[in-house]
Amino acid sequence: MGFLVASAVLVCVTSQRVPGYCKKKPAVGPCKALIEKWYFDYSTQSCKTFYYGGCGGNGNKFSSRKKCREACLPKRPSVPVCKQMPDPGFCRAYMPHWFFNSKSGYCEGFVYGGCQGNDNRFKSCWQCMKKCRTAREANRLCWKLTKEFNKKFLRNVPTAKPLPPK
């Protein structure tokens, strides 16, 4: 009986094995660009951002959190995008975005900080509603929602003024 239990545990662990490149530390590379990428932090079993230099590096470099998770945590179940809570991330930029509120059933505004966060983040009401509801509902609701969004989030944002000609 003990042998059967040990075999079952071994099968479970090896079927969820993390690929070798996901265990490497992120490598910036020798170039000097600042390109936001994602890497898998093996010690915390999570995907995090880093700034890639633009050349070199290693395989632990992904264009999105989703791609990082798919590559390094392929068996882990995830919460559907439209059911995730809005996550502003840990940066402090002021970037108004949209998220789908599964309780109210429509898209609402929130302030994204510019990095991290989750996939329930959209640049427009239409993108949000088309992903989480339907295009027909997006056309019906987004004109009104966008007007409210602009009043709430864009009213006090300083606007750039053109420089006078020299």
UniProtKB/Swiss-Prot annotation:
InterPro entries with a match to the protein in the record: Kunitz_BPTI (IPR002223), Kunitz_BPTI_sf (IPR036880), Prtase_inh_Kunz-CS (IPR020901), TFPI/VKTCI-like (IPR050098)
Disulfide bridge map: C22-C72, C31-C55, C47-C68, C82-C132, C91-C115, C107-C128
GO terms of molecular function: serine-type endopeptidase inhibitor activity; toxin activity
SMART domains on file: KU
Positions of transmembrane segments: none
GO biological process, one term: envenomation resulting in negative regulation of voltage-gated potassium channel activity in another organism
Compartments, record wording: Secreted
Cleavable signal peptide: 1-15
BPTI/Kunitz inhibitor domain span: 22-72, 82-132
Main location group: secreted
Function: Thrombin-specific inhibitor from tick hemolymph (Ki=20 nM).
Entry protein name: Amblin
Annotated organism of origin: Amblyomma hebraeum
